[in-house]
């Protein structure tokens, strides 16, 4: 790096060592250096690369559990442009696309029909991977309300009046329900407007009022109401349990149950606290406490903690998602990291 000279940096704590090592690596990465380790074991970094500081605090990613390539979006400078990056599974950039100025994508999902759905400041848009065309989708006017989630071939969104679950694999509508989102008194968000799909695509969950979540069976359209004012909902890998606000419920009946997970879940967390959970098969990636806390990789089948991922390029927050064989991270330091999860 520096002509073969060994440079000594004195540190008095492990935290300082991590910080110094990260800034030394980052200065190399800013010059275009890409760290790659194709033989990384489970939970080890396969790639770190600098993509650029992001003016977008959401750090969007779009992945699929059936493929290793993935998409990352970042806002450049003072909203001068928004750039979509397409990476392969080893972290090489396949292409970059300019989406245009004065945009901010909060979240994005990869659909099986070769499109991305983007939540651009509460407006849903469709991006074609073939033509690179961005077209309006679902809601035409910005009402400060949006839902967007994806699981398998299914995608869930909110039109402004209805929640829709659509199967892009077979091009069929699975479920649709008219709902009104209640205005919120919480300064962090304008409306109660949250929706998600379960890992095995048998259930959807949504929240449009203060004190309850509704679970929908996507085969029978039967509903179960969960009285809970908490945050950070997630399903178990087998769709049998729904957790929210640190409590656990049977999805079939809505009955409260004991924690079925090998990790504990904190109760009483607020909207802005951290509790992020991602699922791939029996694997669950869990981040709790703070946005800079390590991500734990659990195998719920065996109950084992497989790895703890403490990425050096997370300052305050990170977004992460599973691909077919990895966990990919988009960090607030402007880095993209890939960790091996090939079991």
Outline where the language-model segments fall:
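Blade-level signature of beta-propeller repeat domains, shared across WD40, Kelch, NHL, RCC1
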Residues: 315-343
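A generic tandem-repeat structural signature
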Residues: 105-168
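Short aromatic-glycine-(Arg/Gly/Cys) micro-motifs in beta-strand/loop hairpins
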Residues: 1-7
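Surface-exposed loop/turn elements that mediate protein-protein interactions on large endomembrane-trafficking
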Residues: 43-53, 82-99, 122-139, 163-185, ...
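A short, charged, amphipathic alpha-helix used as a generic interaction element across diverse proteins
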Residues: 12-30
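Repeated scaffold domains used in trafficking and secretory/extracellular systems
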Residues: 55-67, 100-113, 139-153, 181-197, ...
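Short beta-strand elements that form the blades of beta-propeller/WD-repeat-like
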Residues: 68-78, 109, 114-119, 152-158, ...
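Intrinsically disordered, low-complexity acidic/Ser/Thr/Pro-rich linker and tail segments
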Residues: 21, 32-85
